[in-house]
A protein has these predicted regions:
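Early transmembrane hairpin of solute transport permeases
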Residues: 52-96, 112-120, 127-131
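Hydrophobic or amphipathic alpha-helical targeting/insertion segments
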Residues: 110-154
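Residue-level signature of catalytic and energy-coupling elements of molecular machines
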Residues: 47, 97, 121, 182, ...
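Extended, low-charge hydrophobic alpha-helical regions
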Residues: 29, 76-78, 401-579
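Short hydrophobic alpha-helical segments that form membrane-spanning helices or hydrophobic packing faces
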Residues: 54-57, 103-107, 341, 447-452, ...
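Short, hydrophobic/aliphatic alpha-helical segments
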Residues: 30-42, 78-95, 279-283, 295-296, ...
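A short glycine/serine-rich beta->alpha loop
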Residues: 22-25, 69-75, 89-99, 125, ...
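Extended amphipathic alpha-helical scaffolds
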Residues: 2-70, 75, 135-406, 410, ...
């Protein structure tokens, strides 16, 4: 019989202030508890009937949203185990733009099931091995569940149909309008090879007032302000983009001059007088600064430039001369929008005020100010084949297609949430263009995978079969959450029971949750065209399993003492950094 040798009380391994947690109770189960709390937080926001969360971040900004990616980004999770789930959901957001909530609630459910196995006495390595086997089998079966794919050639109706489930989970009731807007904008910028679709070419402009029905798609870049000068419309013009201020350069030092005698006073103005004698009599009365400014903008006008884009301030004197020379001026303060605009007009941003060279100047077909819902906006766009006046022989500039979705809404919070739904929809299009396979939605795919993986686990030998079957049971959380959020807890359980009965029948793999409860709470996802991206499902299952395995692999937590001194407050950063 072996005896346990007690540790010496004076054994000092770490510096003072370190925390060391190890063992099943202190490390593993505590991590699972933290992850479960995060999972329960966003679970009620899952699906079309998910509840909104009202968040106020450290800067006092208000968010009202059911978007899981926004929720976990603004709550600032600090627990190390929960951060693993946050990173997994962020990877899903970057890769697919959809199913971020699925990653969190599925990983949380996997760890809840693992907790029961750990308490029963299974070793974490057996559970992780079983989860990895189940994930591999589940992804193999997922490939077999594909019922259709994105049709070619692409049409607005086919794209809108594929987008509706993803947008309905964010803005239920508005999915028809939003999916149509996103599909129209995506088709307007679709390159000849759809796999090269760039999500950055679809922009969003939010204009307060009206309703979502007043939203529209404008081909080109739209800026929520009108031009600075009197010139409001220019066609087929050269464009100059400046990142510096269009103003007279002035030093910060004082311009005080000490004059001792009359000779010094005469010499002080002699240089300016000689300079003025060389210029035309018309401008002899101008001050030297005004003269230099006029000469600079005259050079810009002589180079053929008719549109000037300013990335900083525009001085009154500069604006006066630009108006006299018939040059339109637009101020764009966002460095991201300035970069996109340079790509659209094929221009090089200049850090100095002066006439651009032929290589630095851009070209735009239409620069105009229009009215949308009582607000004046500026549109910069290139003509395409379907536009009147398009010249296929005109090679004056490389044409870059851009479309802007102009959203209307009553409040800024609603507009922000609509913008997040549009961004998700555009990312879903990008994912579907790479892999167009579709699987039944409404929880049908997860329930069918649960059934098939459970059968697979029953045939395994060894302790891993328990983890495989628990993995299959965890997939049931998706249809169960959809039903509970839509119909309530007790009714949700009955719907899941009916779904299990239908999935045991031939052809039952297409049945999912009916969130509108028209009959018994179930429906055929294929008949109702509720289809999800196979690639998004695959990534969500893989990332959720990897996150759960990572948490289960931890047996010890070591935390150092925080650095001394007052904590530095988090800075707000530039207003343009989150674009």
């Amino acid at each position: 019989m072996s005896l346990k040798v007690p540790k010496a009380n004076n054994l000092q391994l770490f510096k003072d202030g370190y925390k060391h947690l190890s063992g099943l109770e202190d490390a593993v189960l505590r991590n699972i508890q933290a992850v479960s709390e995060l999972s329960d937080l966003v679970r009620t926001s899952f699906g079309p009937n998910g509840r909104n969360k009202l968040l106020i971040n450290h800067l006092g900004k208000l968010f009202v949203t059911s978007d899981a990616a926004t929720i976990i980004r603004e709550v600032e999770v600090v627990h190390p185990a929960a951060k693993l789930l946050v990173m997994a959901s962020q990877a899903q957001e970057v890769e697919m733009g959809d199913a971020t909530n699925t990653v969190i609630i599925l990983a949380g459910e996997l760890l809840k099931k693992a907790e029961h196995l750990l308490i029963m006495g299974l070793h974490p390595s057996e559970i992780t091995r079983g989860y990895e086997l189940a994930c591999k089998k589940g992804l193999e079966e997922l490939e077999k569940l594909s019922k259709s794919s994105l049709p070619t050639p692409l049409t607005q109706d086919s794209l809108a149909t594929a987008l509706k489930p993803a947008i309905a989970s964010k803005q239920y009731g508005f999915e028809d309008t939003l999916s149509s807007l996103v599909a129209e904008a995506a088709l307007a910028v679709m390159p000849p090879n759809p796999k090269n679709f760039n999500v950055d070419n679809v922009r969003v402009v939010k204009i307060m007032g009206g309703s979502l029905a007043g939203s529209r798609v404008v081909r080109g870049m739209v800026f929520g302000r009108e031009p600075e000068g009197m010139i409001k419309k220019v066609n087929k013009a050269k464009v100059a983009v400046f990142t510096c201020a269009l103003d007279i350069a002035q030093t910060e030092t004082k311009g005080t001059v000490l004059i001792h005698n009359k000779e010094e006073m005469l010499n002080f103005t002699a240089g300016e007088e000689k300079h003025l004698e060389k210029v035309r009599p018309v401008v002899c009365s101008l001050a030297p600064e005004m003269l230099r400014t006029m000469q600079i903008f005259q050079e810009i006008a002589d180079s053929g430039v008719k549109v000037v884009i300013a990335g900083s301030t525009v001085g009154e004197l500069a604006l006066h001369f630009l108006n006299r020379l018939g040059i339109a001026v637009l101020k764009v303060l966002s460095k991201f929008d300035l970069r996109r605009l340079c790509r659209v007009v094929n221009a090089t941003p200049l850090a100095r005020v002066g006439a651009p060279t032929a290589e630095e100047a851009g070209y735009v077909d239409v620069f105009e100010s229009i009215e949308i819902g009582g607000d004046r906006v500026t549109v910069v766009r290139q003509l395409v084949e379907s536009d009147e006046g398009f010249d296929p022989t005109d090679k004056s500039a490389e044409k870059t297609r851009t479309a802007t979705i102009v959203l209307r809404g009553a409040t800024s919070n609603l507009l922000d949430d609509l913008e997040r739904a549009v961004d998700d929809g555009v990312n879903v299009i990008k994912a579907l263009l790479k892999d167009g396979r579709l699987v039944p939605g409404a929880g049908a795919t997860e329930l069918e995978l649960a059934k098939r993986v459970d059968v697979y686990g029953s045939g395994l030998k060894g302790l891993s079969q328990h983890a495989v079957r628990r993995w299959a049971t965890a997939l049931e959380v998706v249809p169960r959450t959809l039903a509970e959020n839509a119909l309530g807890g007790s009714e949700g359980n009955e719907v899941v029971s009916r779904l299990w009965a239908k999935h045991e029948q031939d052809g039952g793999e297409v049945f999912g949750v009916d969130v509108e409860a028209e009959s018994d709470g179930t429906l055929s996802a294929v008949d109702h065209k509720i289809l999800d991206s196979l690639a998004a499902k695959s990534w969500a299952i893989r990332l959720a399993t990897e996150a759960a395995v990572s948490v289960l692999s931890v047996d010890s937590i070591i935390m150092s003492k925080p650095a001394g001194g007052p904590k530095i407050p988090q800075q707000a950063g530039n207003w343009d950094d989150d674009d």
